[in-house]
Amino acid sequence: MQNKIVKIGNIDVANDKPFVLFGGMNVLESRDMAMQVCEAYVKVTEKLGVPYVFKASFDKANRSSIHSYRGPGMEEGLKIFQELKDTFGVKIITDVHEIYQCQPVADVVDIIQLPAFLARQTDLVEAMAKTGAVINVKKPQFLSPSQMGNIVEKIEECGNDKIILCDRGTNFGYDNLIVDMLGFSVMKKASKGNPVIFDVTHSLQCRDPFGAASSGRRAQVTELARSGLAVGIAGLFLEAHPNPNQAKCDGPSALPLSALEGFVSQMKAIDDLVKSFPELDTSI
């Protein structure tokens, strides 16, 4: 199976290319924090030679509680994204939840993301595809890796073949997620070689019974990320925060920003090693 390359400016995203770090914060909390977080990622990735795309949401439309912080909204969020691009020269990925958001968001950012909970909503998928933007499809927690091929087909039928697939964990009973490491190769096969990336942060989520917000397993972020990159994938999705315990969304799963360089250094070493190996055919 030939690995497809999705280009984001001068960045090649492919399962056999050096991994791309899609990193940032869960949701835009303020303009100043976005600048701080983006600058930290840029410094680390430039130092280590890791391709980088900034990530954040302008609206977390699927929060469990109506009282939870959602973000600054599309208009203000796009202004912040544009300033990040102008200041740091970064590529940006963000998610959309409504059809009317697709084109305005695609006009500013470089990748638009199809949220896991909405990945089978055909009208939204079609609207995203018709923008011509690169699309990152989050695998729903309730969907098997092999079913991702159907979502890819919807996008391709609209004339867009710039597709990245992302695993963010699978439901394991109630209120818990696990990651099936065999699922990455299944998604590669289902999409006929599209890039597959791993959202390690959201895969660490778990819930307290009757709670209004997700808990998380931040202490295990390194071992889970190592495992994912050891499979041989196109990229890693990561959220970091200056003070995870004070984050407005998913702080229990976020990497402390102070640990970013050490973390990325380890991930690069693993990715370099794994992709230095010749591919073995064990299917005989």
From Swiss-Prot:
Protein name: 2-dehydro-3-deoxyphosphooctonate aldolase
Stretches that traverse the bilayer: none
Protein location: Cytoplasm
Keywords: Cytoplasm, Lipopolysaccharide biosynthesis, Transferase
Gene Ontology BP annotations: keto-3-deoxy-D-manno-octulosonic acid biosynthetic process
GO CC list: cytoplasm
UniProt source species: Haemophilus influenzae (strain PittGG)
EC numbers on record: 2.5.1.55
Entry-linked Pfam families: DAHP_synth_1
Keyword Ion transport: no
Keyword Coiled coil: no
Catalysis performed (reactions): D-arabinose 5-phosphate + phosphoenolpyruvate + H2O = 3-deoxy-alpha-D-manno-2-octulosonate-8-phosphate + phosphate
Molecular function terms from GO: 3-deoxy-8-phosphooctulonate synthase activity
Similarity annotation: Belongs to the KdsA family.
Functional pathway: Carbohydrate biosynthesis; 3-deoxy-D-manno-octulosonate biosynthesis; 3-deoxy-D-manno-octulosonate from D-ribulose 5-phosphate: step 2/3; Bacterial outer membrane biogenesis; lipopolysaccharide biosynthesis
